[in-house]
Design a protein with these regions (language model features):
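P-loop NTPase Walker
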Residues: 1-32, 39, 176-299, 631, ...
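Extended, charged low-complexity regulatory segments
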Residues: 1-197, 201, 205-209
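Generic detector of solvent-exposed, compositionally biased contiguous segments
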Residues: 55-72, 206-214, 219-221, 225-235, ...
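Short, hydrophobic/proline-enriched secondary-structure or compact coil segments at domain edges
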Residues: 89-95, 435-443, 582
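Beta-sheet entry/capping signal
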Residues: 92, 206, 215, 248-250, ...
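A structural signal for short, well-ordered beta-strand segments and their strand-loop junctions
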Residues: 92-94, 156-158, 217, 253, ...
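Alpha-helical nucleic-acid-binding subdomain
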Residues: 238-457, 464-472, 480
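Conserved helicase motor core of SF1/SF2 NTP-dependent helicases
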Residues: 256-272, 277-282, 288-296, 443-456, ...
Length: 671
């Protein structure tokens, strides 16, 4: 870029920032005025409510509600302007419209900056912005309200703007090794995930902007940006569908540490955070009165910290075969209810054959509980009993024919009759591996709790959910579209593994399967090492070499704390500050944390801990989905076994720039 061009871009930036400042001032005035007006409206209605009819009051309150919503929208817009002020845009496309022979300078940023129908910056989600993400120099097109606009992309440019100052301009064709992308990747330092709008790649954009497929299944390698893509997809859907709001979207997250880690992305994009839950927390809806349920992380801690469990039994409980066994058991229970006598209610004899017919024929398609309600209603009508006594009639039926509608009693009975020894409760909590069995019985009794308000479901780390869990999701959210993201190579559930996530098409038949094969997180040296762990070669490293080889160190038992501190110092000298010391389990992490005696190091041991310090100690299964500039794999006594190879892969693939490994578990590495 010439000096004259740079000066011209600087002037444009100044003009845009000046406009945003004016928009902020105007919006503040508007909000202040409307807030005061709403207060006066409410006060007037309160003071004079006796002068109005109920209809008039409802009409006036509706007007107040409308004004409140408008003000809320203005507050959101104000926040977007404030976020944009210091960096209004990140890219520019020069596009020639062939139909009108018009050359357009299209600046792209987090949100639209417009005044009097003149667009100074376009929202990255706008159709015209696809010119930046989808095309290089040459023929191109975008969708508009008037149809497809054809033309030619003459040039593309990316900007580095910090605190309102234009630092650098990059001529860009958005190749994967372009200078701008490499600079962004090299300097990504944060406690939390950041937005990637300025570096969204074409294969990622395909996922983000897909609105034609109801179900998306994304297989993405470690560091391919799966979670970032999912969050940007949410932001895009909120932009595209104005009837959609944050309460209509639900993310299933592996744990609360991860949920906290991703919590900044949507607000950075000018959107509210959406609903987030874990499978265990969500299951509580179906497992009352048990409020304590073992989380997935607790389950993994139990598995990776001891051998005190029945591997075959857990594998069975997570299999689809287990569902079939439960279905068979329930069908057998149902068919063996003895409708062997008539009952008398309110001086009316209800014949046993009639009740059998109602239960096993007329209302057979309904869940147990609903079936009993319908039967009780029928009997109330026949016996001339008020419907307010329906529950009493229902209780009579349950008692007379010994019909069990308690999911926990049924599950206990199933375990006993199937010779599956042991309780489904441990330390006062429902075991993770028993959640699905209990839920299946709950659904048989009560039906699926349909959450019709949820229109979009995002399932992250999908490889760690069983086929049965996926089927449950599909049934619970019948009206929702799904975005399912995972990586079979990062499966850390030792009892269940997909050969390919594409097999989920059996549950989601109208789905599109997409693979993300490029890794943006780790340096090529680290990618080479992690590829060797699994004996694979299909992962493409986007980061250039950074001249830090993977460091393999043998722990000296008498000097190990000194060794760890030496690596920490070495990383800091190389400008590596966001560091994770990752142990296999929490017990090993506790011992190391105690021995290091360093107040500048944070110990992450619970799922609700949030990362507050630059250096953390964290057990392997909590590190999933996170990334750090440097990673120290602390393996005190070579605790990784052959079955843990995917877990070891996950741990090593958290590193961006530097990876140091104490006591490399050579027994499990692929030859």
């Amino acid at each position: 870029m010439t000096e004259i061009e740079f000066k011209r871009e600087n002037e444009y930036l100044s003009n845009v920032r000046e406009l945003i400042t004016d928009l902020i001032v105007d919006k503040n005035k508007s909000i202040s005025k409307s807030t005061e007006s709403i207060y006066e409206q409410k006060k007037f209605l309160w003071d004079n409510s006796s002068d109005y009819t109920d209809e008039e009051l409802v009409g006036s309150m509706n007007e107040v509600d409308l004004n409140t919503k408008i003000t809320s929208f203005d507050l959101i817009q104000l926040n977007k302007y404030k976020q944009s002020l210091n960096s209004p845009y990140f890219a520019k496309v020069v596009f020639e419209d062939k139909e009108y022979n018009e050359i357009m300078n299209i600046y792209i940023g987090i949100c639209t900056i417009e005044k009097n129908h003149d667009y100074y910056v376009f929202d990255w989600r706008a159709p015209i912005s696809s010119l930046f993400y989808n095309y290089e120099i040459g023929s191109s097109s975008y969708e508009s309200s008037n149809g497809i606009i054809y033309g030619e992309t003459l040039s593309k440019m990316q900007f580095k703007i910090i605190d309102g100052k234009l630092i650098r301009c990059f001529n860009s064709s958005l190749n994967i090794d372009d200078d701008f992308l490499q600079e962004i990747l090299a300097n990504s330092q944060s406690d939390k995930m950041k937005n990637i709008v300025s570096t969204i790649q074409r294969e990622q954009n395909e996922v983000i902007r897909n609105i034609s497929d109801p179900y998306l299944i994304v297989q993405g390698v470690a560091g391919s940006g799966k979670t970032s893509v999912a969050l940007h997809r949410i932001a895009y859907l909120l932009y595209k569908n104005k009837s959609l709001n944050s309460n209509n979207i639900l993310i299933f997250s592996p744990n609360d540490v991860f949920s906290d880690y991703i919590s900044n992305v949507l607000p950075e994009l000018g959107e509210e955070n959406v609903l987030t839950t874990t499978f265990s927390d969500f299951a509580k809806v179906c497992l009352k009165p048990y409020k304590k349920i073992e989380g997935y992380t607790e389950f993994l801690e139990k598995i990776y910290s001891s051998n005190n469990f029945d591997k075959k039994l857990i594998e069975k409980k997570m299999s689809y075969e287990y569902k079939n066994e439960i279905d068979e058991y329930l069908e057998n229970i149902e068919n063996n209810i003895k409708f062997d006598h008539d009952i008398e209610i309110n001086n009316h004899i209800i014949e046993k054959d009639e009740i059998r017919n109602l239960y096993l024929s007329k209302y057979l398609k309904f869940p147990y509980s609903e079936r009993l309600d319908f039967i009780a209603e029928d009997i109330c009508y026949k016996a001339h009993i008020s419907l307010k006594h329906k529950n009493k009639v229902r209780n009579v039926i349950v008692k007379e024919y010994n019909i069990c509608v308690n999911q926990f009693e049924l599950y206990k009975d199933f375990l006993i009759k199937s010779n599956y020894l042991g309780s489904f409760i441990s330390k006062g909590k429902v075991k993770y591996e028993d959640i699905m069995g209990l839920m299946l019985i709950y659904f048989k009794i009560n039906g699926y709790p349909n959450f019709y308000g949820i229109q979009q479901v995002v399932i992250d780390e999908a490889q760690d959910y069983t086929y049965l869990q996926m089927e449950i999701f599909k049934n619970i959210f019948p009206n929702a579209k799904f975005t399912i993201l995972g990586d079979v190579n990062q499966t850390i559930n030792p009892f269940y593994k997909y050969k390919s996530l594409e097999s989920l098409k059996d549950i989601f038949p109208k789905s599109k399967y997409i693979e993300l094969k490029k890794a943006y997180r780790s340096s090529s040296e680290i990618i080479d090492y992690t590829n060797k762990i699994l004996g694979i070669s299909n992962i493409v490293a986007v980061r250039k070499e950074n001249n830090y080889n993977v460091d393999i160190i043998e722990l000296d038992e008498s000097n190990k704390i000194y060794q760890v501190n030496s690596i920490l110092n070495l990383m800091n000298k190389n400008n590596i500050h966001k560091i994770a010391i990752i142990t296999k389990n929490v017990e090993e992490a506790k011992i190391l944390y105690k021995n290091l005696e360093n107040d500048n190091i944070q110990f992450i041991q619970n799922t609700d801990d949030s990362i507050q310090k630059d250096v953390i100690i964290i057990p392997s299964y909590l590190s999933k989905g996170l990334e750090f500039e440097g990673v120290i794999v602390y393996n005190d006594k070579e605790t990784y076994k052959e079955d843990d190879i995917n877990l070891y892969y996950v741990v090593c693939s958290r590193a961006q720039h530097m990876l140091s490994i104490f006591n490399e578990p050579q027994k499990i590495l692929k030859k």
